[in-house]
Amino acid sequence: MEQFHATTIFAIHHNGKAAMAGDGQVTFGNAVVMKHTAKKVRRLFQGKVLAGFAGSVADAFTLFEMFEGKLEEFNGNLPRAAVELAKEWRSDKVLRRLEAMLIVMDERHLLLVSGTGEVIEPDDGILAIGSGGNYALAAGRALKQYAGDQLSAKEIAKAALEIAANICVYTNDHIIVEEL
C-alpha cells in the first residue's frame, strides 16, 4: 500500500471499548511543518462512528463527507457504508485520484478503507495508517499483549501515538484521542 506522509492514525478495540488517536502535524512537501494542531480524527453519525485519515487534507474532507453520506444512507451500518464508499472511490475517475486512507470504527467494527477498493477488518482489533503507522501498530500490539489488562483502549491508543511521534519525523506529539 502507498505511504502518506505527515500523519499517524491508530485505532483499537480493547476490553469492550473503541479508541482512535491521531497526531496534529501537517507537512507541506517533505521539508516544512505547516501546522502542529490539525484534527485528523473525527466523530461522525451522531458521535457513534470514529474516522481518521492519512493523506491529503482536502481529499480527506471529501472522503469524510462521502462516508458520512453513506452512513446516513445505510442507517449507520458501518461495514456496508465502508464497502459502498470503497466501490465508489475505486470506480469514479475523479475520486480515484484522491490520495488518502481512512480508518473507520464503531463499537463493533474496525475497518481500513482505501481508494484501491480494500475494506479490511483486522483480526486483532488494531489498525494504524500513515507515515508512523508501522511504529504505532507495533507499539499498540505490544501494549495490548503485555499490558492490556492494566491499560484501557484510550491509554493504549495514546501511548502508541506517543511512541510513533518519538520515531517518525512526520508525526508529532499533539495527540487527539476519541473513545466510544
UniProtKB/Swiss-Prot annotation:
Main location: cytoplasm
Keyword set, alphabetical order: Allosteric enzyme, Cytoplasm, Hydrolase, Metal-binding, Protease, Sodium, Threonine protease
GO molecular function, one term: metal ion binding
Pfam families associated with the record: Proteasome
Single GO biological process annotation from the record: proteolysis involved in protein catabolic process
GO-annotated cellular components: HslUV protease complex; proteasome core complex
CDD domains in the cross-refs: protease_HslV (cd01913)
Catalytic residues in the record: 7
UniProt-listed InterPro entries: ATP-dep_Prtase_HsIV_su, Ntn_hydrolases_N, Proteasome_sua/b, Proteasome_suB-type
Reaction(s) catalysed (UniProt annotation): ATP-dependent cleavage of peptide bonds with broad specificity
Top-rank lineage group of the source organism: Bacteria
Location in the cell: Cytoplasm
SUPFAM superfamilies named in the record: N-terminal nucleophile aminohydrolases (Ntn hydrolases)
Sequence positions that bind Na(+): 165, 168, 171
Record function comment: Protease subunit of a proteasome-like degradation complex believed to be a general protein degrading machinery.
Assembly description: A double ring-shaped homohexamer of HslV is capped on each side by a ring-shaped HslU homohexamer. The assembly of the HslU/HslV complex is dependent on binding of ATP.
Name of the protein in question: ATP-dependent protease subunit HslV
Organism: Geobacillus sp. (strain WCH70)
Taxonomic lineage from the root: Bacteria, Bacillati, Bacillota, Bacilli, Bacillales
